[in-house]
């Protein structure tokens, strides 16, 4: 199955806060996720949501809907887990119906 990567409207603001090295790591991991997004452990409480460790303190959380991989948030560990449900909810309201 071919997956398409999409981004939550707030995601690029998250990227702006990261260092160049962190962004480079994200880009590499994004390609791995695109090839096999289900390889990671499912997040509890988040239907079809998964997490990827970018660094020891930075997490990427994404959501899979059909062939689309929605990048929800990339931020420090605690903030990423605290905010991803809000972004998932807003994504469902705006794009997924």
Residue ranges of each PLM-predicted region?
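Enriched for short, Lys/Arg-rich terminal
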Residues: 2-6, 13-17, 57-59, 63-97
């Amino acid at each position: 199955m071919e997956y398409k990567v999409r981004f939550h409207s707030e995601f690029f603001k998250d990227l702006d806060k990261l260092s160049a090295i962190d962004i480079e790591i994200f880009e590499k991991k994004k390609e791995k996720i695109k090839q096999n997004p289900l390889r990671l452990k499912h997040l509890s409480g988040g239907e079809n949501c998964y997490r990827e460790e970018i660094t020891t303190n930075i997490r990427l959380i994404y959501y899979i809907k059909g062939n689309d991989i929605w990048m929800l948030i990339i931020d420090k560990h605690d903030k990423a887990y605290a905010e991803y449900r809000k972004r998932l909810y807003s994504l469902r309201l705006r794009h997924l119906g």
